[in-house]
Amino acid sequence: MKKNLTELVFILDRSGSMGGLEQDTIGGFNAMLTRQKEQEGEANVTTILFDHEVQLLHDRFPLHAVAPLTEKDYYVRGCTALLDAIGYGVEKMVNIQRHLPADERAEKVIFVITTDGLENASKRFGYEKIRRMIEREKERYGWEFLFLGANMDAVQEAARFGIGADRAVRFENDAQGVAVNYHVVSETVCRMRQADCPASIGAEWKEEIEADFKKRHQE
């Protein structure tokens, strides 16, 4: 494998329920990219947008070459084909990693999945198939998956497709919640990229998001 190379895969919800948060999402995503560009090591970026359809926006772009997200890229519409987006991303990355020469394969693969609603529109993939795919890559190759969900029990939903409670968190789907989300994700991805063993990073990564959600629901 190629030391210090990370494949970053961002799966972003742009379904209609994200309306009103377009600029917050764009700003948060761009700030996260800027932060990643400051880190040591190489990274390729794959960005997948989904509503009732799945769109590949960045296809393993070198991190330094990824342009900022704009409203031409990110606009909301439609329903939530969450499983199709995850399945497409995992399938794509599996094919890439398997077919590259061993010395060109990424040392780490990190998925960040963000959605504000439950699955309701997928046609190709179901929960059981996604669970098998994710568990295989986690167990055999140490891939990391972070799941951030709003308007749901994110831990329970993540468990349905093979992501553990220590890698799932519920966030508040408003401007402040989205900002906290991207800040935490950015710092967590930085830690995972620099860690000898990303799996050693525990559930503490999500404490700030949990605290933000809890605070607003106590007010």
Describe the function of each predicted region.
Residues 1-219:
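Acidic, low-complexity intrinsically disordered regions
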